[in-house]
């Protein structure tokens, strides 16, 4: 147990210590790298543990900051190069007073009496060894460590448990041969081809209590899940199913994808009865928060003692699930139920702390499925036998340049045929060359149609503000599509209540997206959104007096189409 400072000494020490600590942290507060809450949390706790070293307290403030910026912990030695200072124009050029020897600072911070090991439950911070970097442990808050430990324990328990024989399909091979007719011509479950991956994914989810089905967009995850559902419902089996995703939009996409995958015209080879097809098309999908039953006070309706009433739980877009929500999900799913997690480790990360899927699944340079190969088993650890990785994306087969850029940016060096095998920096250069139009993928047939360059930065490596011409090009498709359709409808007798018109309007809106690499900075999401919004408002002001100001359509829950601007 850590010795504490007597109350009288603690009172005398606190004022001077707080003043020195806040003075040391002030440049980081001014640059908005640290928040007042990070500093106050350490300042209030330090006297209780006899911590009076300002440099160690600064390191602990960054550990307290980590969950606030979506990380469970921090490597202090690597911190300066990881911090994005472009939170505003002034902070972008700020020279922050980092300790001169970062490695020594990290080691010194870990020696604080406020930092303990995994088994020392009384300390507010924990140092956690890392397999890949054993010399530089992560520094975590105790809460984040406990969340990680509970997730790891729950996953390990579920991964080691197979479905009992009574819960398995009577003739899985025959079912797979029927659901994957192309595979049946070779060998069901074979490893040579994308259809083999799909069949293996279904076999995995049908026989294990935990299945991770991962891969990029268009690789066949939904295709496999639809056939898993068809296999489990085949023959009139009774099965309670819960479908969920982190957001309402993702849940709606999941539901729609399953409906499309079971459409008779779109999937004539899906050999299932009309009853099974109807059940699949009627399956609802909900948000993960609603599935777990989150309450306003932060508690959950479904827990270990009151599990989700479903025998099969499928969660899509798992890359967006944070550490705490994953822990809640694992505790809420019944121990006897199947849990299938779908996602792409390289897609959107969680907003809250912890990128669970990225930690569970090997990086994209491991291209073999989780059920094949010792290399993947070693990389994936105890979940290798519960993971199926999809490797071929049909979505980008007609756009090789885009596929090449994605492969470069995902991990610098993957097994893409157009990438150098062992030089990550060359892979990055290759991506920049494709962006610049000086190089193309070997299968690219329309190189001039894939990428439209909106200008070049004033200096290499410097983020500059977009020009008026660039903003006009970015806003053009929006103003000429969705906005033009909406303005026209508000100014004439278009029947706004017509469902066909509503679908057309929403489809026009869905065709416009501007994606940014950064959240902040001159080319980040926040400033681009503000700049584009100004142009849109200015364009819509033209002719405003000629519009009738019709109220539009109330879609419920505060959502409107056509509300006057």
What do the predicted segments below correspond to?
Residues 75-78, 121, 164-171, 193-194, ...:
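Short coil/turn segments at secondary-structure boundaries
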Residues 200-202, 208-441:
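ASCE P-loop NTPase helicase motor core
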Residues 169-179:
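Short, conserved phosphate-binding/catalytic loop or strand-edge motifs used
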Residues 151, 205, 247, 287, ...:
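Conserved hydrophobic/aromatic pocket- or pore-lining residues that grip, position, or stack substrates
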Residues 185-207:
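N-terminal pre-P-loop "Q-motif" helix
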Residues 3-171, 319:
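N-terminal accessory nucleic-acid engagement/regulatory domains that precede
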Residues 31, 35, 69, 141-145, ...:
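Conserved phosphate/pyrophosphate-binding and hydrolysis machinery centered on Walker-type P-loop NTPases
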Residues 346, 353-564:
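Conserved helicase motor core of P-loop NTPases
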């Amino acid at each position: 147990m850590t010795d504490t400072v007597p109350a009288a000494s603690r009172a005398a020490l606190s004022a001077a210590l707080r003043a020195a600590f806040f003075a040391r942290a002030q440049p980081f507060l001014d640059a908005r790298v640290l928040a007042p809450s990070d500093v106050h949390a350490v300042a209030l706790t330090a006297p209780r543990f006899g911590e009076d070293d300002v440099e160690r307290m600064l390191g602990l403030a960054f550990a307290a900051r980590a969950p606030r910026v979506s990380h469970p912990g921090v490597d202090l030695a690597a911190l300066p190069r990881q911090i994005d200072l472009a939170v505003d124009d002034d902070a972008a050029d700020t020279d922050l007073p980092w300790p001169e020897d970062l490695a020594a600072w990290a080691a010194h911070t870990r020696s604080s009496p406020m930092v303990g090991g995994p088994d020392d439950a009384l300390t507010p911070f924990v140092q956690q060894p890392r397999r890949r970097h054993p010399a530089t442990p992560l520094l975590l808050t105790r809460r984040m460590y406990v969340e990680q430990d509970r997730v790891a324990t729950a996953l390990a328990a579920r991964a080691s448990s197979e479905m009992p024989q009574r819960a398995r399909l009577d003739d899985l091979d025959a079912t797979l041969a029927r659901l994957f007719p192309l595979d049946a011509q070779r060998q069901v479950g074979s490893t040579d081809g994308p259809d083999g991956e799909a069949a293996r994914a279904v076999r995995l989810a049908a026989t294990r209590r935990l299945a991770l089905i991962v891969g990029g967009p268009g690789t066949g995850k939904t295709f496999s899940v639809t056939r898993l559902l068809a296999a489990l419902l085949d023959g009139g089996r009774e099965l309670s199913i819960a479908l969920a995703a982190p957001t309402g939009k993702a849940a709606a996409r999941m539901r729609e994808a399953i409906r499309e995958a079971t459409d008779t015209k779109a999937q004539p080879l899906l050999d299932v009865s009309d009853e099974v097809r109807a059940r699949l098309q009627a399956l609802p999908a909900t948000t993960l928060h609603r599935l777990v039953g989150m309450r306003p006070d932060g508690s959950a309706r479904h827990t270990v003692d009151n599990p989700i009433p479903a025998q099969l739980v499928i969660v899509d877009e798992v890359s967006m699930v944070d550490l705490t929500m994953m822990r809640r999900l694992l505790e809420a799913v019944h121990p006897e139920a199947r849990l299938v997690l779908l996602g792409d480790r390289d897609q959107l990360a969680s907003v809250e702390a912890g990128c669970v899927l990225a930690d569970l699944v090997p990086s994209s340079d491991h291209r073999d499925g989780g059920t094949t190969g010792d290399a993947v088993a070693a990389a994936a650890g105890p979940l290798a036998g519960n993971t199926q990785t999809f490797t071929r994306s049909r979505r980008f087969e007609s756009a090789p340049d885009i596929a090449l850029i994605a492969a470069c940016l995902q991990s610098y060096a993957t097994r893409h045929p157009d990438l150098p095998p062992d030089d990550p920096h060359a892979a990055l250069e290759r991506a920049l060359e494709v962006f610049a139009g000086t190089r193309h993928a070997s299968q690219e047939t329309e190189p001039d149609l894939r990428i439209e360059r909106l200008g070049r930065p004033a200096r290499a490596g410097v983020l500059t503000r977009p020009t008026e011409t660039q903003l006009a090009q970015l806003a053009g498709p929006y103003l000429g599509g969705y906005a033009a359709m909406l303005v026209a409808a508000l100014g004439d007798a278009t029947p706004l209540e017509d469902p066909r018109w509503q679908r057309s309007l929403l489809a026009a809106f869905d065709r416009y997206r501007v994606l940014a690499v950064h959240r902040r900075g001159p080319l980040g999401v926040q400033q681009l959104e503000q700049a584009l919004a100004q142009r849109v408002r200015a364009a819509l002001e033209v002719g405003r007096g000629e519009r009738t100001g019709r109220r539009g359509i109330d879609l419920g829950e505060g959502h409107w189409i056509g509300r006057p601007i």
